[in-house]
Amino acid sequence: MKKKKKANPLIVILALAIVMVLITVGVVLILGYRFTTLPNGAKFLGKSENGQPVSGTIKYQTGMEAELDYFAKTIRYKNGDIYIGDIVNGCREGNGVMQYSATGDVYEGQFRNDELSGTGVFKYAQGDVYRGTLLNSKKDGYGVFEYSNGNRYEGTFRDDVRSGQGKFVWASGASYEGGFENDLKNGYGVMTFESGSKYEGTFKNDMRDGDNCVYTWANRERYNGSFRNNLMDTRKVDENGEFIKGENGEYVHGDMAVYTFSTGRTYRGYFVEGQAVGVRIENNTEEVSNP
């Protein structure tokens, strides 16, 4: 009679381990736990019902982690941030409130694809408030930004900065209405100073720069002509903004400017760096701090 071969202990242990893993996986699946990839690319490990993640841990591609509670409408982030609002497939979607623990800022409004997108109100801890549209968590489209120091901007934003047409009003009473690009005054605009003086013309990167501009002082004196680098200047410039010189080494001027005094008397001639060539005129243009 042949003796039965004894089973290899290692094989037995391996088989038992596989069985235990299968049982564990089966129980986990029965209880509704899943490991899935969310629409925003994050990984979710937790309980799901009818394909909807309802409770568990979210691991974002940035390394951030958060705890999801679908029924409580909350996502609590590891860094202390809290989202309260509509949740779809583990992502912020619909209306909600986002509280930022590090800064104390609060956003209340619309969300799409787990980003601040749509219309909403963003309140900064230092007192600034933005009301308007956002896209992918950046100010984009029409909005109103009220600064804690009393300044106010109303107009369009692109990629989180003032770009397009808008109006900026300083707490001092000065105002600018016109074009913006990359948060700076660019293109045609009208700048009204607290004193009542006014500039109408072109801006380049926050500076008065262009032809056919008009600067009117509160005392009714007026300058009609070109500006370069914030100053009255009739010299021509090339495509790089450099002043052009003629063959004789002298600067080349464009059209003559007209300076009208409050008495009605006028001076017609050329200007360089704010001064009339050969004539002394005392009026100075004004400045305000950048928005």
Region locations from a protein language model:
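Glycine/tyrosine- and acidic-biased, solvent-exposed loop/turn segments at the edges of beta-strands
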Residues: 2-291
